[in-house]
């Protein structure tokens, strides 16, 4: 799946969190119906490595089927399922049955799991005249969740609420997930879907979204509309209320471990992200912080007087100095002198966000990389071509004439290293 180093890095990061801050996993009824084996396998794996996710589920398709069987037609208003008193008994039965099916499937996989079908969401009528027995959430009681976590058992929570007087109310699973996340402030929020992520105009999964730099442009794309637009807006609202390090992952059940434990991931990773600083002179940057970023990323030391002797063309630096691109000029084409990302920012999509901003205004570019650089796979994907030498791989973008490429290769060959082993 990934290198042992990558897996160990993420496992260490997750293990240092308070148990209830690791992850909330929201599972739709369709996943429970169509992909329960992959779901339980992935959740069981997390428990095996010492992590306990908090699972919240819906039961939409199961409820549709049960209501149809008794001749009751589904009715929704503003995205909420109208729940009449005569259907509440069916709603409750379906949620309890769905919850127990997941519990039993987890137990067959050797996992410990706790059924929680009440006592978490204190609710009020959202609008009884319009929606019937549909609730909004007044308060979240995490005591049942904490008890389950103390026993190293996966809490499996149904999206049902109760009023202070004891009336059970149907709660939209997305609403329940949002309120639960707001209280728990988890590091990861995971939405498991059949599509495995958000899809772009070509139907391909978007790897990562850095909301600070990409949201406004993304939301204006013609292919972002309807349910997808609403989902992105909801996720932005959700992350705006969480710590900066929190993120949302949208993936398939079978790919959950890959999404959590590898830099590349498998699905769509969405973070609030960081603003990117653009500078054309060194004096506009915090050079000690930039030096720390570069040296930590490469695990090498910059040559003395690097900033004094290196003519800066442009620098793109994340506001917390966790990722940076430094461009200089060798000849007539911008030269990528440094692309640095801190270890704790690996897999966030932050490096890609900084890279994308740089590429938008740098149509021509060349750079070199050592043969053992872990970023080479990314460079192969991002470059138009490359040339292999004894000590370097030389990459370029936007260069179409052989003589120009030859000059860039010569510059890379002659340019002395700026990092000391």
UniProtKB/Swiss-Prot annotation:
Its EC number is 2.7.2.8. GO terms for cellular component: cytoplasm. It is found in: Cytoplasm. GO terms for molecular function: acetylglutamate kinase activity; ATP binding; L-glutamate N-acetyltransferase activity. Keywords: Amino-acid biosynthesis, Arginine biosynthesis, ATP-binding, Cytoplasm, Kinase, Nucleotide-binding, Transferase. Gene3D superfamilies: 3.40.630.30, Acetylglutamate kinase-like. InterPro entries: AceGlu_kinase-like_sf (IPR036393), AcgluKinase_fam (IPR004662), Acyl_CoA_acyltransferase (IPR016181), ArgB_GNAT (IPR011242), Asp/Glu/Uridylate_kinase (IPR001048), GNAT_dom (IPR000182), NAGK-fArgBP (IPR041734), Vertebrate-like_GNAT_dom (IPR006855). Pfam families: AA_kinase, NAT. Pathway: Amino-acid biosynthesis; L-arginine biosynthesis; N(2)-acetyl-L-ornithine from L-glutamate: step 2/4. Residues 1-252 are annotated as: Acetylglutamate kinase. GO terms for biological process: L-arginine biosynthetic process. PROSITE patterns: GNAT_NAGS. Its main location: cytoplasm. The keyword Nucleus does not apply. The keyword Phosphoprotein does not apply. It catalyses: N-acetyl-L-glutamate + ATP = N-acetyl-L-glutamyl 5-phosphate + ADP. Residues 274-420 form the N-acetyltransferase domain. The record marks 26, 231 as: Transition state stabilizer. Substrate binds at residues 59-60, 81, 170. In the N-terminal section; belongs to the acetylglutamate kinase family. ArgB subfamily. This is Acetylglutamate kinase. It comes from Xylella fastidiosa (strain Temecula1 / ATCC 700964).
């Amino acid at each position: 799946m990934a290198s042992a180093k990558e897996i160990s890095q993420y496992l260490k990061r997750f293990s240092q969190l308070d148990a209830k801050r690791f992850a909330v996993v929201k599972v739709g009824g369709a996943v429970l119906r169509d992909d329960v084996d992959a779901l339980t396998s992935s959740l069981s794996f997390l428990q095996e490595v010492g992590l306990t996710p908090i699972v919240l589920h819906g039961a939409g398709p199961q409820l549709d089927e049960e209501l149809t069987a008794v001749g009751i037609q589904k009715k929704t208003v503003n995205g909420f399922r109208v729940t009449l008193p005569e259907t509440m008994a069916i709603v409750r039965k379906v949620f309890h049955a769905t919850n127990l099916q997941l519990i039993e499937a987890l137990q067959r996989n050797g996992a410990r799991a706790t059924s929680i079908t009440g006592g978490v969401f204190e609710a009020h009528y959202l609008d009884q005249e319009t929606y019937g027995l549909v609730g909004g959430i007044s308060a979240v009681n995490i005591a049942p969740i904490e008890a389950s976590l103390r026993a190293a058992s996966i809490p499996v929570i149904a999206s049902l609420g109760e009023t202070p007087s004891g009336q059970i109310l149907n709660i939209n699973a997305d609403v329940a997930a949002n309120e639960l996340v707001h209280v728990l402030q988890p590091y990861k929020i995971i939405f498991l879907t059949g599509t495995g992520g958000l899809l772009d105009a070509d139907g391909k999964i978007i790897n990562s979204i850095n909301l600070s730099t990409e949201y406004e442009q993304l939301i204006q794309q013609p292919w972002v509309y309807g349910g997808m637009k609403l989902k992105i807006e909801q996720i932005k609202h959700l992350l705006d209320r969480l710590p900066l390090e929190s993120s949302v992952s949208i993936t398939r059940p079978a790919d959950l471990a890959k999404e959590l434990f590898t830099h590349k991931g498998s699905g769509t990773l969405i973070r609030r992200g960081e603003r990117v600083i653009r500078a054309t002179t060194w004096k506009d940057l915090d050079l000690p912080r930039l030096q720390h970023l570069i040296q930590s990323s490469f695990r090498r030391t910059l040559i003395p007087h690097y900033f004094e002797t290196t003519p800066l063309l442009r620098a793109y630096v994340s506001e917390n100095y966790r990722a940076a691109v430094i461009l200089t000029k060798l000849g007539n084409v911008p030269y990528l002198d440094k692309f640095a990302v801190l270890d704790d920012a690996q897999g966030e999509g932050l490096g890609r966000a900084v890279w994308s901003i740089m590429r938008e205004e740098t149509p021509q570019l060349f750079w070199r990389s050592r043969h053992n650089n872990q970023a080479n796979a990314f460079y192969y994907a991002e470059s138009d071509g490359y040339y292999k030498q004894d000590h370097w791989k030389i990459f370029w973008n936007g260069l179409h004439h052989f003589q120009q490429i030859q000059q860039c290769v010569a510059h890379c060959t002659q340019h002395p290293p700026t990092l000391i082993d």
